[in-house]
């Protein structure tokens, strides 16, 4: 993992991120405290008014709620936004940084959806892709809360797997890194 530092990105000072290459780049950022706090507060304060996102997501998770959807209205989901402009601007700035870091130019960006997966014991998300209305797109995970324990590891306890995020790569070959299980902390993105 390499650490890079940029001076400014759309008023984001000292943008720090980690980098892993899995056939495509995976960048790991730390969310500013004000953005992190805003998302958590909005989720908790509006929980009863948030649209369930379970019908359109693959996760085997009871509590999946949408904070933002800006796509075509569907039977499963209609356009809505509970997030203030500074939060959606943060997402867009990070996605634009990702594209610039990878030297991807002339790529139109559209923020399609933001939701919360509130996972409990025995719930999981199978391997899947995110693509919105297109076959290409950027996907992200932000850590808003973590439990005090992920439970007992029933096998290979020296290699912790419970509650881990696993990102699968698009590379092959003898020395290729094919997956990444980042250590997760609050505010990781």
Language model segments and positions:
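Non-heme Fe(II)/2-oxoglutarate
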Residues: 11-106, 122-126
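Residues at beta-strand starts and edge strands
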Residues: 23-25, 110-112, 136-138
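Catalytic core of non-heme Fe(II) oxygenases with the double-stranded beta-helix
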Residues: 117-189
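A short coil-to-beta-strand element that immediately follows conserved catalytic motifs
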Residues: 104-114
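N-terminal amphipathic/basic-hydrophobic helices that include classical n-h-c signal peptides
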Residues: 1-11
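Generic internal hydrophobic packing segments that stabilize the cores of diverse globular domains
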Residues: 84, 88, 92, 113-116, ...
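Generic preference for hydrophobic/aromatic residues in regular secondary structure cores
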Residues: 2, 22-28, 33, 116, ...
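Non-catalytic cap/lid and distal C-terminal segments of serine-dependent acyl enzymes
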Residues: 14-17, 29, 115, 183-185, ...
